[in-house]
Amino acid sequence: MTHLKDLPLHTLQFYATAPYPCSYLPGRQARSQVATPSHLIHNNAYSELVTQGFRRSGMFTYRPYCDGCQACVPLRVPVSTFQPDRSQRRAWKRHQKLLVSSLKLCFLPEHYQLYLRYQNSRHAGGGMDHDSIDQYTQFLLQSRVNSRLVEFRECLPNGEAGALKMISILDVLEDGISAVYTFYEPEDQAGYGNYSVLWQIEQARQLGLPFVYLGYWIAQSPKMNYKLGFRPNEILQNGQWIASSTAKAISHE
């Protein structure tokens, strides 16, 4: 892990939180390293922080800082070398007719209702399935960086936009796109999540940005392990981005 003294952002301060229950690995305690003050973390600073393994949740910019555990590994996909596998190509082809709109962060009841359906289906009992409007807004719709809310809608026979199928929140950084959060209609075998990542990779390519940052890969968490399937990819290890295929074994203890 990069030490505080090595961070180039001298105007910011960094502190460690108290331990709290890990959201990904049952029975574990987690801690975060938090960057403050939030009003100084605009797009340039945040882009630099992301390359150091930070993420954001609303105005909260953090990275894992756990005692004796390195299970959360930052992962990014180099756009120029990405090669989709067979299932990813199927997901891309299947959803080509979705109508896509990129919006500023905004609250719409339709979005919130989709969020609740997604949480109740995919993460029931995790707490987020009962998020209030205020919690949803603080989590996804507050940002000081270059953020976008992307709608994916069914295309009706007349070419007009129909039912809302998916929402992706993303940040456009200096060197890439950072995938913040995606939620979608909980349809079996639809592959919306894979399509969202593929769409962001293509969007980064069109914008001339070299990377898509997918957050943390956690080998022991099935909900997070899928990220390794977007290959080739790079992970942040000992302060350096390296190809995951050549990385040394990572300790999860």
From Swiss-Prot:
HAMAP family: Bpt. It is found in: Cytoplasm. Its main location: cytoplasm. It holds the Pfam family ATE_C. One of its GO terms (biological process) is ubiquitin-dependent protein catabolic process via the N-end rule pathway. One of its GO terms (molecular function) is arginyl-tRNA--protein transferase activity. Keywords: Acyltransferase, Cytoplasm, Transferase. The lineage of its organism: Bacteria, Pseudomonadati, Pseudomonadota, Betaproteobacteria, Burkholderiales. Its EC number is 2.3.2.29. It comes from the Bacteria. It is an enzyme of class 2 (transferase). Transmembrane segments: none annotated. This is Aspartate/glutamate leucyltransferase.
